[in-house]
Amino acid sequence: AVYHGPTGLRTIAARVHRLTGILAEGLRQGGVKVLTARYFDTLHVETDTDVPGFNLRRVSATVRGISLNEKTTRADVACLIEALTGKATDIATFNTLDAQAAKSSPLADLLRSDAILTHPVFNTHHTEHAMLRYLKKLQNKDLALDHSMISLGSCTMKLNATSEMIPITWPEFSD
């Protein structure tokens, strides 16, 4: 949330929901019964098919759960539609499904309208460099063992002379 910020999270959520809508519409048009009426990223579908390469949750013998996330691609959705319906999904079909899914979003009345993640920390660190600086700043605030107790725990090692350490390099001790 710190890296993506409120705008990034909304973008990710909208994309995942859109892909889920495309999947639902493609499955419906392919004859697969979608049991989930209101969904965000997860669908329950009536099928006993397991798709190789995908981890479908077995809800029952005839129902599978399909969850999408920000790593899901258009190709993944097309592959799922093809595997579960037996119909190939080309780019034109996919774009048609996208347009149809956008018109029938089941969550339109549940969309949040108020501001989210309003604290400045969620609105300032949106590059890798800024994020690393922020994490380093947090690390510097932390009182850790490497800043406080290390001197007590390692004083015996510090006092060992180099000549005293030579025997640990002998093959008799190292193998």
Enumerate the predicted regions with their spans.
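Conserved small-domain helix->loop->beta segment predominantly found in fold-type I
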Residues: 1-60
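PLP-dependent enzyme catalytic core of the Aspartate aminotransferase-like
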Residues: 49, 54-174
